[in-house]
Amino acid sequence: MHNLSYASEEDTYTDTDFTPSGNSTNSTSYSPATIIGLAGLVSFLILFTIVGNVLVVIAVLTSRALKPPQNLFLVSLASADILVATLIIPFSLANELMGYWFFGEVWCNIYLALDVLFCTSSIVHLCAISLDRYWSVTQAVEYNLKRTPRRVKGMIVVVWLISAVISFPPLISMDRNTVDERRPMCQLNDHTWYILYSSIGSFFAPCVIMILVYIRIYQVAKTRTRNMSEKRRDPDGGSGTPRLENGLSREDSRRENGHCSSSPGERKPAEDNPDADLEDSSSSDEKAKRSQNETAPSKKDRRSSRKNSSSSKHSSRKSRASSKSLDLFSSRRKRRNTISRKKISQAREKRFTFVLAVVMGVFVVCWFPFFFSYSLYGICREPCAIPDPLFKFFFWIGYCNSSLNPVIYTIFNQDFRRAFQKILCKSWKRSF
């Protein structure tokens, strides 16, 4: 994030040489062994960050389970972390180990602007994701219909524009004085207004919004869970389905007890025996022809013929009633399947919301110490001094956050875990 220097009117410091008490050094104090160790450690951090976030991008773009458009936010967030690892951390490391800025004034200006932009965009992304979660919970049907890939991409563009508006204007007033032209420093001014502006705009304000939104999401989810549990306890709830099931069981019991003269084929003419009605009608026609060919039929025969025809009509009515009950049963079954799919989708949404809450919590934990000490220095300067090694630790812990999101996805989300395994297995097979 803010790879800044803190320059007062009397002194100027690089970010790595800053101490809130006002002490600074313009040359590196690291031994060769320490330089090698730090370079190796940070190089591993850079590589891990790039590989992990590239996996996130590939997983979202190729995995069917990760296709929902809201996951495009994670692609954009991972892209910001990749840019931090490639364009910011290497130059911060060189500045730390060398003790001065080696890469010229033009790149210094670009480097500072991008550093502020990428960290600001990370937290604004998380803020947008929290709002997306909130709308999907409170306006599930309407918002899910509106949440198309095109709309999400538009929201991502807005996130980057907001980040640029927060980050770039103060950079116009940067002080670029150097203590020694032979050892130039890449630095911003440390005026109180800028420190507070950047801290509030880039961290504290989005962080407060994000936390409040997630508290609201938790409240809504808790209320819904309580309402659902009350509905389950309600004896009148869902009485339609038991009645259908009882009706079917009564029909089955009547058939078993011999009360139904029709064959089992009557129960599902539409599904298993589509020609049942046709067979009934053809048999009745044959009976009619036989009765016409018989001469001088007796009264007994006529009575039996009427009984047969009434029995056939009764059987046909039963068949139609049974068909209707089966249609009703199949529609109920389809409805149950739809409900179960919705429950699976809701469970996935809950898991995803939990994962994003972990991502946001880790981000706050990683960056809060830096911004707190940075703001404290801007307000009260020397009286609020913290040890220089501690400030450097806070500074680099913030950068480490860029590598943690893929780890969080792997630990807490099964869809990401499967996607990562599939990608890595394919890469492994191709290499052999």
UniProtKB/Swiss-Prot annotation:
The keyword Heme does not apply. GO terms for biological process: adenylate cyclase-inhibiting adrenergic receptor signaling pathway; G protein-coupled receptor signaling pathway; platelet activation; regulation of smooth muscle contraction; regulation of vasoconstriction. Disulfide bonds join 108-186. It is a multi-pass membrane protein. It is found in: Cell membrane. The keyword RNA-binding does not apply. It holds the Pfam family 7tm_1. The record marks 198, 202 as: Implicated in catechol agonist binding and receptor activation. Residues 15-28 have a biased composition (Polar residues). GO terms for cellular component: plasma membrane. InterPro entries: ADR_fam (IPR002233), ADRA2C_rcpt (IPR000735), GPCR_Rhodpsn (IPR000276), GPCR_Rhodpsn_7TM (IPR017452). Residues 227-236, 248-258 have a biased composition (Basic and acidic residues). Residues 61-72, 132-152, 216-351, 414-432 are cytoplasmic. Glycans are attached at residues 3, 23, 26. Residues 1-35, 99-108, 176-191, 380-392 are extracellular. SMART domains: 7TM_GPCR_Srsx. Keywords: Cell membrane, Disulfide bond, G-protein coupled receptor, Glycoprotein, Membrane, Receptor, Transducer, Transmembrane, Transmembrane helix. CDD domains: 7tmA_alpha2C_AR (cd15323). Residues 1-28, 224-342 are annotated as: Disordered. One of its GO terms (molecular function) is alpha2-adrenergic receptor activity. The record marks 115 as: Implicated in ligand binding. The chain crosses the membrane at residues 36-60, 73-98, 109-131, 153-175, 192-215, 352-379, 393-413. Belongs to the G-protein coupled receptor 1 family. Adrenergic receptor subfamily. ADRA2C sub-subfamily. Alpha-2 adrenergic receptors mediate the catecholamine-induced inhibition of adenylate cyclase through the action of G proteins. The order of potency for this receptor is dexmedetomidine > norepinephrine > epinephrine. This is Alpha-2C adrenergic receptor. The lineage of its organism: Eukaryota, Metazoa, Chordata, Craniata, Vertebrata. The gene is adra2c.
